[in-house]
Curated annotation (Swiss-Prot):
InterPro entries: TMEM213. Keywords: Membrane, Signal, Transmembrane, Transmembrane helix. It is a single-pass type I membrane protein. This is Transmembrane protein 213. Residues 28-70 are extracellular. The gene is TMEM213. It comes from the Eukaryota. Residues 1-27 form the signal peptide. One of its GO terms (cellular component) is membrane. It is found in: Membrane. The chain crosses the membrane at residues 71-91.
Amino acid sequence: MQRLPAATRATLILSLAFASLHSACSAEASSSNSSSLTAHHPDPGTLEQCLNVDFCPQAARCCRTGVDEYGWIAAAVGWSLWFLTLILLCVDKLMKLTPDEPKDLQA
């Protein structure tokens, strides 16, 4: 059986680690969001009756924004792993390069 090069093994290990971290984080987020999603669902007809009410403070308390601080951390870790993988692949390619001809040939 042929062994994998070091960069390929490192890429595979980093990819598996990131995938397991991502699945664990998404499972935790979905379990915490499922209980909060059922709480505040008013009837659409009642919102039309309240024309002069400012809903921004209530929306700020009830609705989560797009990405919380853990999401930014996960994105930063994901991108850094991606760039590290690309760097390792480039280093692996550079290590495998061989010159086509010797440097000290007569012109």
